[in-house]
C-alpha cells in the first residue's frame, strides 16, 4: 500500500488469494495501480510466474522486495529438523528464487533489490536458531549479489526490522512444526507494518546498503562490533524473560 501511495505500480505475491484480492482492491479504490499473483515462494516455478506477471503487466521490474517470512520459537535441542528446512525454504530460498528471475530486469532498470531480514540476521536469537540462520543466509546472499553487480548499477539493500506486529509472529513454528498461534510479546509496543514499509521506502530512495530500524537494531549493530559477549548475555536475558520462554 505504501509503495502504491508513492505512485508505484505494485505487483503483490502471496499464498492467500483472498488477501491479495482485498489488498489490490483497496489500492485500486484509492487510485493506485496494482495487480497480484498467487505464489508459494518455496516453489521456483511460481516465483518465475510472479516475475513474469510483473513484466507482462508493466514491462519490467524496478524494485523487488523479498518479504515472505516464517519464524520459529523453540530450542535447537527440541526442534524437529523439518522445521529448520521449512524456514530455509521460505526465508532463504524464496529470496533466491525471486531474485534469480527478477535479476535481468533489475539490472536493466538499475533498480533495487531489497531483502527484509531482521535483527535476528545481525545476531543470533536464542529460541530462533532456524530463523536467525535463514536471515544470515539471506544477508550473505544479497551482499554477494551486490558485489557481483557493482559495475551494473544495481542497488541491494538489507532491511532489518525489530519486533513487528505482523502475522509472522502468530504463524511462528514451534518445536514440532505447529504454529504457536499467539505471541508472547505486547503487540502494542511493536512497530507496525506500515511504519516498517515507510522506512524501507526511504531506504530505497536513498539507496542504502543496510536499513536498521528502531534503537534495538542500531544498538545491536553497534554493540556487536565492540562487545559481542555482552550482547550474547543481553539477548539471553531478554529471551528468558518472555512468557513461556523455551529457555526456562
Task: Indicate where each model-derived feature is located.
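Conserved glycine-rich Rossmann-like NAD(P)H-binding loop of the short-chain dehydrogenase/reductase
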Residues: 8-22
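The beta1-alpha1 cofactor-binding region of Rossmann-like NAD(H)/NADP(H)-dependent oxidoreductases
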Residues: 17, 38-49, 81
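Active-site helix of classical SDR
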Residues: 99, 134
Amino acid at each position: 500500500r505504501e509503495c502504491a501511495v508513492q505512485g508505484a505500480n505494485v505487483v503483490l505475491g502471496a499464498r492467500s488469494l483472498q488477501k491479495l484480492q482485498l489488498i489490490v482492491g483497496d489500492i485500486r479504490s484509492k487510485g493506485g495501480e496494482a495487480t497480484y499473483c498467487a505464489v508459494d515462494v518455496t516453489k521456483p516455478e511460481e516465483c518465475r510466474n510472479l516475475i513474469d506477471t510483473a513484466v507482462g503487466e508493466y514491462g519490467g521490474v524496478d524494485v523487488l522486495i523479498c518479504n515472505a517470512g516464517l519464524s520459529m520459537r523453540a530450542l535447537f535441542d527440541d526442534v524437529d529438523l523439518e522445521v529448520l528446512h521449512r524456514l530455509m525454504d521460505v526465508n532463504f530460498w524464496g529470496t533466491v528464487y525471486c531474485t534469480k528471475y527478477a535479476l535481468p530486469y533489475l539490472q536493466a532498470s538499475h533498480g533495487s533489490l531489497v531483502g527484509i531480514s531482521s535483527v535476528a540476521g545481525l545476531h543470533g536469537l536464542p529460541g530462533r536458531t532456524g530463523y536467525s540462520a535463514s536471515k544470515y543466509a539471506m544477508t550473505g546472499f544479497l551482499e554477494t549479489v551486490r558485489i557481483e553487480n557493482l559495475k551494473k548499477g544495481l542497488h541491494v539493500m538489507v532491511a532489518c526490522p525489530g519486533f513487528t506486529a505482523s502475522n509472522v509472529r502468530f504463524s511462528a513454528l514451534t518445536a514440532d512444526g505447529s504454529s504457536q498461534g499467539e505471541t508472547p510479546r505486547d503487540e502494542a509496543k511493536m512497530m507496525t507494518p506500515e511504519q516498517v514499509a515507510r522506512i524501507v521506502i526511504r531506504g530505497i530512495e536513498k539507496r542504502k546498503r543496510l536499513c536498521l530500524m528502531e534503537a534495538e537494531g542500531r544498538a545491536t549493530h553497534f554493540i556487536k562490533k565492540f562487545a559481542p559477549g555482552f550482547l550474547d548475555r543481553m539477548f539471553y536475558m531478554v529471551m528468558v524473560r518472555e512468557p513461556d520462554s523455551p529457555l526456562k
